[in-house]
Amino acid sequence: MQSHPLIFCITFCISIGLIFFPLNPQYTFRSVPHKYPRKKDEWDKIPIFAYADLHKKKLGWTELRYPSIFNKDEIDYILYDPEISYTYTGKEVVVSLGQYDSIFVSSDFKHKKAYNAKSHYLPHVRPVSQNLQIDLFKTIHDRGLQPHYHHLMYDKYRKVFYRFALMPDDNIKPFSNNPHQSFSIIILNKDYEIIGETKFPGNTYAHHLCFVGKKGLYISENNENNPQFDENKLVFRCFTLQGRKK
C-alpha cells in the first residue's frame, strides 16, 4: 500500500511567525524561518506548504512558493495579509489568495501556473498592506471596503471549482458570525476556465458555511439577518449547475 506524506498549509501569524495547520489536528508543528517585516523580493522564497512523512518521521518544506505579487517592502507594522484558500483534486493543488485575481495550480508542489479567476463584479484585486497599529475595529471596517476573495472549493462530482468573492461593504460588523455582505461564486471548469458567475444577496446566506454534495453546492441559510431564520433549524439550500441561456 503506497503512503503519502501529510501536506500542511502555512498560515502567517504576526506574533510567532509561521504556524502549520494540518488536516489532522493531532499534529501541530511550529517554526519561524521568515521573520517580519519582509522585502518584496523575498516572497518567492517563502513556501506555501510544509509536509510530514509519518513513516519516515520527517518534516520539510515543499518547493511551492508564494507568487511575486507583493509590490512593496513591509515596514514595521505595515504588513501584508497573505491569506490563502486551497483545494486538492487528487492530482493538482489549487491555491487562491484573498487579494489577487488569479489562482495558482501545481501538480508537483514545486512549479505553479496562474489562471485568471477574476470576478466580473469586482475591480482588479491586488495585495494591500495594512497598518496593524491602528484601531482593530477600523482595520476590520477598512478591510470590508476592499474587494476580497474568500474560499475555494472543488466539486469532484461535476469536476468544477467554486471561488467565493466578497463584495465591498461599508457596514461590516466586527466579529459577527452572520455576514450580511453580498457575494458571488465564480465557477471554473476542470481546465480552470471561467464558465459562469452568480451573485448572491446579503442578509440571506452564511457563505462561510457550505459544502459540496452529490446533488450540488449547499450553502447555509442560517443567517440571523435572514427573515426566515430559525435558530432551532440548520438549513442549507442546494444550488445546481445550470446551462447558460442562449
Which stretches of residues belong to each language-model region?
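Long, acidic/polar, low-complexity amphipathic helices and coiled-coil-like
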Residues: 1-54
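Surface-exposed loop and turn segments in beta-propeller and other repeat-based domains
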Residues: 1-6, 58-79, 113-144, 199-204, ...
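Structural signature of eukaryotic scaffold interfaces centered on beta-propeller domains
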Residues: 4-22, 26, 76-89, 144-157, ...
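Hydrophobic beta-strand positions that form the internal "hydrophobic ladder"
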Residues: 19, 28, 93, 161-163, ...
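Short, conserved, GDST-rich strand-edge loop motifs in beta-rich repeat architectures
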Residues: 22-44, 163-180, 222-236
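Loop-centered beta-sheet repeat module
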Residues: 38-107
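Beta-propeller blade signature
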Residues: 39-57, 101-104, 176-193, 232-245
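Loop/turn-rich, solvent-exposed surfaces of beta-rich toroidal or solenoidal domains
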Residues: 143-188
